[in-house]
Structures are given as C-alpha cells and as structure tokens.
C-alpha cells in the first residue's frame, strides 16, 4: 500500500505538497486513506494476523532511470494528482492556479536534476 505522506522530491515545492494533500483529503472524503501504508502493521494486528512483517518499498527516481521518470513520476503519480484537479477545485480545496502550479512543480521533478521519492509498504501475515 502506498503512503502519500512519504512523498519527497526535488526541487521542493510547498504548492505541489498542497496539491498532493488535496488527493489525501479527497480520498478521505470518499472513505479511503491515502496514508494507509504506515498503518499496515496495526491493521493486520487488529485483524488477528500473526507473524506480521511490514517492509517499506521505496521508489526513488532521478535522471539515471528515464523509464521510471516517465512511468512513475509523470505517468503515475503526477497524472494521479492531475486527475483530481477538477474535484479539488470544485470542493474549494485549492485554486485552479495553485493546482496548475503544483502539477507543474511535480513535472519539474521529472526534468534534469530533479528527484522523486515515494514509499509503498508491503505487509504479510498468517491467520490461524
């Protein structure tokens, strides 16, 4: 499971972070949890799983791996934020100008010298 709170990038951008937070809020409003990755251990434990193991699966992207720049930073993460733009604007979470700037700043992380980091969490356990 992913965890949007684990998103780090360069160049840093407060407005990009605000755009990401819109995704977190919209998912919460729809009954989801965009920060669920950090909660896997307690969720599995509360569900009576045993032998629980949770491990981070970090995705780190920079110029040295153009396939990941295109496939993850641009076509997955930034595209997801772009996809919630209209709803975030209509619910007054962010202005059109701000979300456009946030998306542009996320795209900047996919250009020369930029970096992008995100963590997924894998949880396993057994049930009696």
Can you describe what each PLM-predicted range is?
Residues 21, 38, 82-83, 119:
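A generic alpha-helix surface/boundary motif
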Residues 38-40, 97-100, 117-122:
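Short coil/turn segments at secondary-structure boundaries
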Residues 8, 93, 115-117:
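Residue-level preference for alpha-helix termini and adjacent loops
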Residues 2-65:
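Conserved catalytic/acceptor-binding region of the Class I
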Residues 36, 91, 124:
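Short glycine-rich loop/turn motifs that provide flexible caps or phosphate-binding loops at active sites
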Residues 47-52, 67-71, 111-128:
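Core SAM-dependent methyltransferase catalytic element
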């Amino acid at each position: 499971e992913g965890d949007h709170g684990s998103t780090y990038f360069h160049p840093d951008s407060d407005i990009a972070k605000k755009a990401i937070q819109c995704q977190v809020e919209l998912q919460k409003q729809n009954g989801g949890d965009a920060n669920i990755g950090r909660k896997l251990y307690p969720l599995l434990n509360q569900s009576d799983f045993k032998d629980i193991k949770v491990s981070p699966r970090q995705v780190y992207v920079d110029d040295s791996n153009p396939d990941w720049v295109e496939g993850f930073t641009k076509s997955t993460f930034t595209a997801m934020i772009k996809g919630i733009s209209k709803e975030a604007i209509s619910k007054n979470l962010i202005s059109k100008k701000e979300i456009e700037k946030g998306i542009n700043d996320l795209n900047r992380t996919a250009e020369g010298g930029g970096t992008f980091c995100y963590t997924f969490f894998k949880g396993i356990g057994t049930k009696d």
